[in-house]
Regions:
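Single-stranded nucleic acid-binding surfaces, predominantly the OB-fold ssDNA-binding core
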Residues: 16-250
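N-terminal amphipathic/basic-hydrophobic helices that include classical n-h-c signal peptides
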Residues: 1-25
Length: 250
């Protein structure tokens, strides 16, 4: 029988740190855990966000077309050293990472997601429009469901380690046979995932009103188990965090 623990934030972070310490011993190259390439158009004027060691970072949004010609509107964070003269309407090709961070709103901690730009590529050298490759650990029990139209879906929260003892917590969605594959996986399983980053509008009811919100997630196209088990997988332990304030800063 699985043992379920409702953990505090500290417990949750300490469990994830087990993965990080194990990867340190294995001399993991964290850059390979999270690789994202996008090509699209800047649609908002960049605005100042924050500074790290004197380096300013700006936020804007990029419009990325799907093969269906629908578009995903994704938030990006970019250093002033890369931003240069970028403006609304400019086409850009980005290499970076999909990251999470914590934002305090109305005294509540909110999970925020952004594309962190590490490099701007020449447009003619970036044939990929939207592709992400991740290596990470399941940190909440997958949620499997079937839509009214009979489509199978599974939601996963993936902890992806990066340097300096930080982790990103990324929502992923699997479809069809991939959903069936992940539905019985355990917390602590290490996965390799490829897919695309998407935006999705949904309605949230507040009182008598419904407002439109936007979710950002990874739509999985390929998924497999990585080649080594983790301590949590071996212990058959499920961690249920009580809040979302476990998110690392950018």
């Amino acid at each position: 029988m699985k043992k379920t623990i409702t953990s505090t934030t500290t417990d949750y972070k300490s469990k994830i740190s087990v993965y990080f310490k194990r990867e340190i011993r294995m001399n993991i190259n964290y850059d390979n855990n999270n690789i994202l390439q996008l090509k699209g158009k800047i649609i908002e004027t960049p605005t100042y966000s924050h500074s790290v060691l004197g380096e300013g970072f700006f936020e804007t949004k990029i419009e990325v077309k799907r093969l269906s010609q629908e578009v995903d509107i994704l938030p990006i964070t970019i250093s002033e050293r890369l931003l240069g003269e970028l403006k609304v309407g400019d086409e850009v090709a980005i290499k970076g990472q999909f990251r999470s961070y914590n934002k305090l709103e109305d005294m509540h901690s909110k999970l925020m997601l952004t594309v962190f730009v590490r490099e701007l590529l020449p447009l003619d050298q970036a044939p990929v429009i939207n592709n992400i490759n991740l290596v990470g650990y399941i940190c909440k029990e997958p949620i499997y469901r079937t839509t009214p139209f009979g489509r199978e879906i599974a939601d996963i929260l993936l902890a992806v380690n990066r340097a300096y003892n930080k982790s990103d917590y990324l929502p992923c969605i699997a479809w069809g046979r991939n959903a069936r594959f992940v539905k019985d996986l355990q917390v602590g399983e290490k996965l390799e995932i490829s897919g695309r980053v998407q935006s999705r509008n949904y309605q949230k009811k507040i009182g008598e009103e419904s407002i439109t919100k936007t979710a950002y997630e990874i739509s999985i196209s390929n998924i497999c188990l990585a080649d080594e088990p983790t301590p949590l997988a071996i212990d058959n332990l499920i961690i249920t965090p009580t809040d979302s304030s476990t998110v690392a800063t950018i």
